[in-house]
Amino acid sequence: MKVKELRDLTDAELAKKIDDSKDELFKLRFQLATGQLDNPMKIKDVKRNIARLKTIETERKLGIR
């Protein structure tokens, strides 16, 4: 998702996205450890997405945007 689309989400939807992304990261790490992961770059993408979501969450708490 684009950052603009993420900013349009409600706080509850944002929290849900963060939880879903963390679950996905856990599954990807497990696949990496067992040698089943086809694309290791997927881990990097998910981690960046989590960082984006947390940044938006922090901005809202601080009233920056």
Curated annotation (Swiss-Prot):
Gene3D superfamilies (alphabetical): 1.10.287.310
GO biological process per UniProt: translation
Signal sequence interval, chain numbering: none
Single annotated GO MF: structural constituent of ribosome
Lineage top rank: taxon: Bacteria
InterPro entries for this protein: Ribosomal_protein_uL29, Ribosomal_uL29, Ribosomal_uL29_CS, Ribosomal_uL29_sf
Keyword terms: Ribonucleoprotein, Ribosomal protein
GO cellular component: cytosolic large ribosomal subunit
Similarity remark: Belongs to the universal ribosomal protein uL29 family.
PANTHER family: 60S RIBOSOMAL PROTEIN L35/50S RIBOSOMAL PROTEIN L29, LARGE RIBOSOMAL SUBUNIT PROTEIN UL29C
HAMAP family: Ribosomal_uL29
Family matches, as NCBIfam families: L29 (TIGR00012)
Protein name, as recorded: Large ribosomal subunit protein uL29
Gene: rpmC
